[in-house]
Amino acid sequence: MEVERLKTKDIDSYRNFIKDVFGYDVSKKNVSDAMKNSIILALKLDNKVIASITLEESKEYIKGKKYYYASYFGVLNDYRRMGFATKIFDKVEELVEKNKIDYIELTSGNQRKEAHSFYSKHNFRIKDTTVFIKFYE
């Protein structure tokens, strides 16, 4: 099982993955657009996406630091605690080195304690900040 970029043929499986792990219905168009503008890594078993992460590359214009913003990092419930998140993250680390990325940033809900434990084990630190959001209809 190899971690690789999501392919067009895997969009439906990925949509099911997002629904199962995060509870969101995502359209084929939105996934297709994300595939053009982001790196979506997936781990599949029998053509089913069981783990994934999305990386968006950006650059701090003041400090000149390149970074990945990571989102939708998860593993299907039946496949947790089997090393698949680590396998995905190992691939991310390869890309960090290859693309000379300075750091990875992610946001995680307060209730995701198991994920927070994983991040800590992989040397992420909590950034002392508060996130504000304003929605427009």
Which residues make up each language-model segment?
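Conserved GNAT acetyl-CoA-binding A-motif
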Residues: 89, 96-108
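Alpha-helical elements of Rossmann-like donor-binding domains used by nucleotide-donor carbohydrate transfer enzymes
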Residues: 13-17, 87, 91, 131
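Acetyl-CoA-dependent GNAT
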Residues: 5-65, 71
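Conserved active-site alpha-helix within GNAT-family acetyltransferase domains
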Residues: 86, 110-130, 134
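Conserved acetyl-CoA-binding loop-helix of GNAT-fold acetyltransferases
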Residues: 72-75, 81-94, 117, 121
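Residue-level recognition of the GNAT/N-acetyltransferase active site
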Residues: 76, 109
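Extreme N-terminal starter segment of soluble prokaryotic enzymes
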Residues: 1-2
